[in-house]
Amino acid sequence: MRIAKTIAGASVALSAAAAGAQLAEPVHVRNLNPLVSIFGLPAWDTVPIGTRFGATAEVANHYRFSLQNNERLRLDGETVRTNFAFTHGFGSGWSLGVEVPYYRVSGGVLDDVIDGWHSAFGMPDGGRNGRPEGELLYAFGDPLEPSFVLTEEQSGIGDTQVKFARLIGRDQGFVVQASIKLPTGDEELLASSGSSDWSVTLLRTRPLLARKRAASYYWGVGVLRAGDPDLIPFDAETWVPTGIIGGSWQVLPEFGLKGQIDVHGAFYESQLEEIGETAIQATLSAWRRMGQRGQIEFAVVEDLNVSTSPDIVLQVAAAWQW
């Protein structure tokens, strides 16, 4: 009888810990603007208990034509980014993690869906209907002679990120993380900047488990030191601030909702708004626990500062912890 009670108590404790961890875990959002995703913007991670493996797939459709003085930018295509992340948490509150993304750049399949959405609700399409659907064209640089042109579908590995994190604070509710991005990816398809970046972030997480329906909030600030990209003709900023604020609500024992806002400064000294202004993205997601060790999450990411990030990003993520 005592053994049964002990097992039941341990199961409840594990379930509560898993719920608290999922509530306090931000959605892993990155700006998939092709000229921004080459940099090492950090994902906002918590320190896991034990080992965690995650896989995230996201798709972003791009359509921007911009000209300012001697700078020109053309983006017409689609990015599918699949990210594999492995993190191990040590008993002392430290964690070590690594992320490796895989990119596929193509004309995509969402053009028709987006055109239909704009037509159905009478929304402006920015000239999308004037371009062939499913076409890939990335070109930027001098208006007369672009220094970079991509017109053929490609795929390849992106830059690897290595992360070190530490829990601090009286309630262990702060996460300090340092990360470095290594130039392991393919620059020719904009999966790499060709240089190393490093960043330092501080994340505050606060699960509120003593409520009728558990909830949480989190916020974070950080800074990234960006290396000079090899193939991009625009002058890059050296220091880029970043931040996050969000929360989660556990609607049912195995199901919850999240909302958050991610922001980062401009990565380029450019008059083009797509790369020379602050980016703000809003995310809504729904997550579900899969047993004691797994979870799956679906998210929609929308740009709040129009043109600085993809109009919409669809994301699905799965994670397992042991």
Where are these regions (language model features)?
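N-terminal signal peptide c-region/cleavage motif recognized by signal peptidases
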Residues: 13-20
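Transmembrane beta-barrel domains of Gram-negative outer membranes and organellar outer membranes
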Residues: 21-191, 195-227, 232, 238-321
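Short N-terminal leader segment in a subset of presequences, especially plant chloroplast
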Residues: 9-13, 32-33
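Bacterial N-terminal signal peptides that target proteins for export
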Residues: 1-8
